[in-house]
UniProtKB/Swiss-Prot annotation:
The gene is secA2. Monomer and homodimer. Part of the essential Sec protein translocation apparatus which comprises SecA, SecYEG and auxiliary proteins SecDF. Other proteins may also be involved. Its EC number is 7.4.2.8. GO terms for molecular function: ATP binding; protein-exporting ATPase activity. This is Protein translocase subunit SecA 2.
């Protein structure tokens, strides 16, 4: 139920937006009379007005939107309605436009994309999967090209990496890019691993529109995009520790808070571990690897559920997105947790790889100069949008009144009773010819009900978020007479269900939802599958005390729940009190789930701050190195002086043998100078002597180069090698640190403080190590030339 104040604030926002809509309508009347050539010419004119400073994007908006609107009609046969203009204005302002299913978000986005692309900077439409990005791009590309702009799909389905690099540069030179959040995130990470200026391809992240914005920057905000590197030293403890954990008893050996994904050993558990593994002190420095593996095994055993968080498929652990129900093939849990789950399932443990580069979606989109989003369920996440991203949500009115009937929840004692009643209702609906869409929380449940319906001679389509393109087609057909579709919550999302001939008279699409989801936004999205653009329809959610939401999140008194559960069926059927009580339990459990989700995202955001700041600083330094074009004229003495001062200050006693050893290890393999004249008690004298050796080695290296051009390449490569090797170690260390600190202190505020303190210390160590490796690399790296005359650098 909407609060009166919410409605008033939204109406005030709409009031100011409608003034702009009125100006767009005035311009729309004007441009209708333009010839095609005159309308196309406006794009050139707009660019010139922006370049000259006569106009800004804001002042151009009414006229530019009118031009894009008229072009849409001439090219696509679609004329954006006023509700779409409202959404388009909200998107340009960098906020969240709530637009209901079927209101034309794809067409709405074309206007702010066109306007912002006029600036010549990077403009992006980001959606959740390749199919939707490709579908929307192919539908809208003719419009942009007709208007004189270039548009491209942000990815190529070609395995050849060298081809992809060249193609990427071509893709990102276009005015408008249609891509996915995952593709863009990985491109950002790959771009910042480039070893030359020519290897970079990603332009400025200027303006972006995120489709299904709540799914991407709220539900998936914590999801890290990870590029893996070399294998870590593999632990052989996974299976052994799993056997130990199997002997432990909850509340005796360990304590667990499933709602917070927290688990830890109690004193008896610590004693049991010390006895089992024959260690004197489990928390000694020598036993930290063992403690880490025990914590991983506990989490894998009790906090990750098969067929809920993951399932075993073709000998692999395939993760499941709890919010969306979608499978995540190729995605792995970090810091050894994936391997612990493999051990739990009795599988061969895969190699745990180090992390080369990582970023969360939350921080990826904060890199944009401006971004906005579209969703049908923005209002329910408004406070979080504002707290995390400073975005307000504006609810655009629907073009036609919503006719869908959202029926009250149907309440049952047990899941078996619920399932019987639900199947009975589905059979009755199917007999009338109404199309039915049954939505389940898990793929396992969807497969079960699909089989049951087949056994009852009700043919059905099963959609469990495996084949996006195929499922989009199937979900689009779910509105035909007699259609029966069984799906998980995310299957076919982004595709409208249009009613077939005669279905409207039958009452439209009936959406049956097997249980409340962990988030009320998802419930609302599922109801919204029916009743698009004023169509009739209905939705109903079936609930019981056995539901996952209740078992996982309910904080109700267990005895009270058992008392409700034990009531006989006759009393239940006559008990409104029972219905109200169960609804209260479910609603409260869902609220707890949502609150924990918000807290988890806030916690993840806090942890991410250190690595985000460090990543920005490191990538800035990489870019400075890539911009070096006059290495021959650069003076690297200041860098070397810093490094040599570190060396002399770190040594307690400077001796001749130690200084000579340092020179061999860091400056020159051929050093043979007599050092008798050096006063090793004078640190500054040692620094001066080392600087002399550094300059001699640098001059020798320069002499070995064929040209200043190759010397420039040499300096860039050896410096990048120093930065990357140290940064890779730091990223991997921070991933391990986060897992360790969070586990040790159960996610409390002191865990965050501890993490940031250690992260800062390690960053300072890393910056010193980068300088040291730069000096070592520039002195001791060698350059040779292959048969084609191309330089090959050999690092020390």
């Amino acid at each position: 139920m909407k609060h009166k104040l919410d409605v008033t604030i939204n109406e005030l926002r709409l009031k100011s937006i409608r003034k702009i809509v009125k100006r767009i309508n005035t311009w729309s009347d004007e441009v209708k009379s333009y010839s095609d050539d005159a309308l196309k010419q406006k794009t050139i004119e707009f660019k010139e007005r922006l370049a000259s400073g006569v106009d800004t994007l804001d002042t151009l908006l009414p006229e530019a939107y009118a031009v894009a609107r008229e072009a849409s009609w001439r090219v696509l046969g679609m004329y954006p309605k006023e509700v779409q203009l409202i959404g388009a204005i909200v998107l340009h302002e960098g906020n969240i436009a709530e637009m209901q299913t079927g209101e034309g978000k794809t067409l709405t986005a074309t206007m702010p994309l066109y306007l912002n692309a006029l600036s010549g900077k990077g403009t992006y439409l980001i959606t959740t999967n390749d199919y939707l990005a490709k579908r929307d791009f192919e539908e809208m590309q003719p419009l942009y090209e007709w208007l004189g702009l270039t548009a491209s799909l942000g990815f190529v389905d070609i395995v050849d990496y060298e081809y992809q690099k060249g193609e990427k540069r071509n893709i990102y030179e276009h005015d408008i890019i249609y891509t996915t959040n995952g593709r863009l995130g990985f491109d950002y990470l790959i771009d910042n691993l480039a070893d030359s200026a020519e290897g970079k391809f990603l332009p400025q992240l200027n303006y972006g529109i995120i489709d299904e914005v709540d799914s991407i920057i709220l539900d998936a905000a914590q999801t890290p995009l990870v590029i893996s590197g070399a294998p870590r030293l593999q632990s052989n403890l996974f299976h052994i520790v799993k056997e130990f954990v199997d002997t432990l008893i909850e509340d005796v050996h360990f304590k667990m808070k499933k709602t917070k994904k927290e688990i830890w050993l109690l004193n008896q558990g610590i004693e049991a571990a010390q006895s089992y593994f024959n260690v004197e002190d489990l928390y000694s420095e020598q036993a930290m690897v063992l403690v880490r593996n025990i914590n991983l095994a506990l989490r894998a055993q009790y906090l990750f559920e098969s067929n809920v968080d993951y399932f075993v498929y073709n000998g692999d652990i395939v993760l499941i997105d709890r919010i969306t129900g979608r499978m995540l093939p190729g995605t792995k849990l970090q810091a050894g947790l994936h391997q612990a789950i493999e051990a739990k399932e009795g599988m061969e443990v895969s190699t745990d790889k180090s992390v080369m580069a990582t970023i969360t979606f939350q921080n990826l989109f904060k890199l944009f100069e401006s971004f906005s989003g579209m969703t049908a369920t923005g209002k329910l996440g408004e406070s979080e949008f504002f707290d995390l991203y400073s975005k307000i949500v504006v609810q655009a009115p629907t073009d036609k009144a919503i006719q869908r009937i959202d029926e009250p929840d149907k309440v049952f004692r047990s899941v078996d009773e619920k399932n019987i009643a639900m199947i009975h209702d589905i059979v009755e609906l199917h007999e009338t010819g109404r199309p039915v869409l049954l939505i389940t929380r898990t793929a396992e449940a969807a497969e079960y009900f699909s089989k049951v319906l087949f056994q009852m001679d009700i043919p059905n389509n099963l959609l469990i978020a495996q084949n996006v393109a195929k499922e989009a087609q199937m979900i689009a057909e779910a509105g035909q007479i007699g259609s029966m579709t069984v799906a998980t919550s995310m299957a076919g999302r982004g595709t409208d269900i249009k009613l077939g001939e005669g279905v409207e008279a039958l009452g439209g699409l009936a959406v049956i939802i097997h249980e409340h989801m962990e988030n009320s936004r998802v419930d609302r999205q599922l109801r919204g599958r029916s009743g698009r653009q004023g169509d009739p329809g209905s939705s109903c959610i079936y609930i019981s005390l056995d539901d996952y939401l209740v078992k996982r999140w309910s904080d109700s008194n267990l005895a009270e729940n058992n008392q409700l559960y034990s009531l006989d069926a006759q009393r239940l059927s006559q008990s409104n009190l029972f219905n109200r009580k169960v609804k209260q339990i479910v609603v409260k459990a869902q609220r707890i789930s949502e609150e924990q989700g918000v807290k988890a995202r806030e916690m993840a955001n806090e942890f991410e701050k250190s690595i985000s700041i460090q990543r920005d600083l490191v990538y800035e330094e990489r870019n400075r190195v890539l911009e070096i074009d006059d290495a021959e004229n650069r003076d690297f003495k200041a860098l070397a002086k810093d490094v040599f001062e570190m060396f002399v200050n770190e040594e307690k006693v400077l001796t001749k043998s130690r200084v000579v050893e340092y020179i061999y290890q860091n400056l020159s393999f051929q050093f043979n100078k007599d050092v008798a004249c050096v006063n090793f008690k004078d640190k500054q004298a040692v620094v001066t002597f080392l600087l002399e050796q550094f300059e001699k080695q640098l001059a020798l290296n320069r002499k070995n180069m064929q040209s200043a051009y190759y010397y420039n390449i040499f300096v860039q490569k050896v410096f990048l090698k120093a930065i990357d090797s140290c940064w890779l170690e730091q990223v991997d260390y921070l991933q391990q640190l986060k897992a360790s600190v969070n586990q040790r202190q159960n996610g409390q505020r002191n865990a965050i403080f501890e993490y940031h303190r250690v992260a800062l210390d390690s960053f300072e160590v890393m910056t010193r190590n980068i300088k040291k490796r730069m000096v070592k690399n520039i002195c001791q790296s060698m350059i040779t030339f292959d048969k084609e005359g191309m330089p090959v650098i050999h690092f020390p």
